A protein has these predicted regions:
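PLP-dependent amino-acid enzyme catalytic core
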Residues: 1-125
Length: 125
């Protein structure tokens, strides 16, 4: 993270869910394909999928701040809403289990743009 961005986050509570920087891999095959099309670019992939909690993913970056706020407020339960295959819901449940918070998921089986919406409620422990 650039120093100016780090400074902006300095006063915000955060719990460490990542354990250090995730690796960058150079996408040489994609670079070569683009070069054949006249685009000369260095392309790197940030491998947040290698974070060891709940299958990893970038959602853990925001959850570091959300969960720190929950803990700082003295709360013991998290409720979240999302689609049946929501990465946010999956990772929220994994983080709650890791830090000892109760978690309730409200999951939709259809797009929220169509009615009726069928929901499933899950309690994670």
């Amino acid at each position: 993270m650039a120093p100016s961005i780090q400074k902006g986050f300095a006063g915000i509570a955060r719990i460490d869910l990542i354990g250090g920087p995730t690796p960058l891999y150079r996408a040489t095959g994609l670079e070569s394909a683009l070069k054949r099309e006249g685009v000369d670019a260095g392309i790197y992939l940030k491998r947040d999928d290698l974070i060891p909690i709940g299958g990893g993913g970038n959602k853990l970056r925001k959850l570091q701040y959300h969960m720190a706020g929950v803990i700082a407020a003295g709360q013991d339960t998290v409720i979240t809403f999302g689609g049946l295959q929501s990465n946010h819901a999956r990772l929220t449940a994994a983080v709650c289990a890791k830090v000892g918070l109760e978690c309730h998921l409200i999951l939709t089986q259809r797009s929220t743009s169509t009615l009726p919406i069928t929901t499933t409620t899950a309690t994670c422990s």
